């Protein structure tokens, strides 16, 4: 929508996007994520992208921006989606503010994508178990390995995303409000059918993608 005002604060601005107002963090002039985010809020934004939430001040402003009706997108350095929520709590964000402002958490990893020249990799069950596979995962398990050809050189071509997509369900919200930890949030996510990063990666491997 041409009328939608999309503004970002990034460190650094890696890609210039037409139609989007982008600001780069610059510590030399005290342009931090928090200060840039405050400046963005004075420009009547519809969508805000904060490159990274690194401290409590930035987290608080991002949460308040969400609570006042803005769509806020950001990143945190954590191991998976449940730990992202725990990270916000550990930073000092009140649980009720998290449940009121956060709607979706996505954890991402990138793996090398196997090229079409791949070939089946047949390993004995003992080797797979030694690599961390569970016995219940070995049935009809087919993995692949890189070969290499004129189209890829080393058997790989690009990257494939491995994701954990965790909506903030009512069950997860209750755990957050009760002061629960990342392990409890992860258990609730599994019970609601949300695959973790390991399960997502295993599916991509079975599909011959990585």
Name every feature range the model reports, one short phrase each.
Residues 1-210:
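Short, flexible helix-loop junctions that flank or precede catalytic/ligand sites
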């Amino acid at each position: 929508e041409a009328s939608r005002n999309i503004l970002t604060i990034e460190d650094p601005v890696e890609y210039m996007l037409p139609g989007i107002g982008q600001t780069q963090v610059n510590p030399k002039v005290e342009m931090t994520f928090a200060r840039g985010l405050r400046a963005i809020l004075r420009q009547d934004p519809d969508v805000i992208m904060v490159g990274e939430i690194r401290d409590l001040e930035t987290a608080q402003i991002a949460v308040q921006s969400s609570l006042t009706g803005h769509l806020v997108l950001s990143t945190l350095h954590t191991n998976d989606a449940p730990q992202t929520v725990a990270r916000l709590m550990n930073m000092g964000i009140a649980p009720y503010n998290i449940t009121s402002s956060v709607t979706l958490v996505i954890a991402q990893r990138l793996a090398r994508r196997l090229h079409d020249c791949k070939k089946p990799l047949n390993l004995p069950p003992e080797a797979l178990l030694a690599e961390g596979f569970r016995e219940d995962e070995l049935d009809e398990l087919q993995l692949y390995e890189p070969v290499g050809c004129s189209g890829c050189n080393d058997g790989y071509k690009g990257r494939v995303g491995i994701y954990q997509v965790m909506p903030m369900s009512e069950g997860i919200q209750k755990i957050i409000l009760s002061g629960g930890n990342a392990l409890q949030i992860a258990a609730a996510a599994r019970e609601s059918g949300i695959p973790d990063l390991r399960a997502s990666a295993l599916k991509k491997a079975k599909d011959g993608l990585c």
